[in-house]
Amino acid sequence: MGLLVWNGAQAAAGKEVPVLSASHVEKGTNPGPYNSDPPTSGQHYASEFEAGFFNEADLTSLPAYPEGYLVHNLEHGYVIFWYNCAVLDEAGCEQLKTGIRDVMEEFDGVKLIAFPRASLQVPLVMTSWGRLQEFGAFDAGQARRFVRANRYRAPEPAAP
């Protein structure tokens, strides 16, 4: 409870994105469109993904429209690190992934997801419910600030 009170008193980080309807849609249907890329709110499925780091190779084993699950995570107070290694060389990609993992570990991975997104024009975009921050280059300090300010800042922060 103390964390929720502290988070409510702290200013949110990142750019504000207008919050869309949070209604549930049937799994397998396209939950979009969304008003940002990646999404920060909107229609979604009634279930979510587990916290953790998803690699590009994981995408083939995931259900269609992963955004439908991930927006539900955002509604539960998650922060998502959306990354695109296609805009980096191999060494840059590994540095980005290592930096993301390190920040996630600092927060014990609680309510944190890293997820690849090919549509990004920058290497990293972090989102929370109604908030978005783009990174032209990884900045661990900025990433930590985003997590501290925005994790649990959502309609259902106490949900798992």
Residues of each region from the PLM?
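Helix-rich interaction surfaces within compact, conserved domain-sized segments
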Residues: 99-160
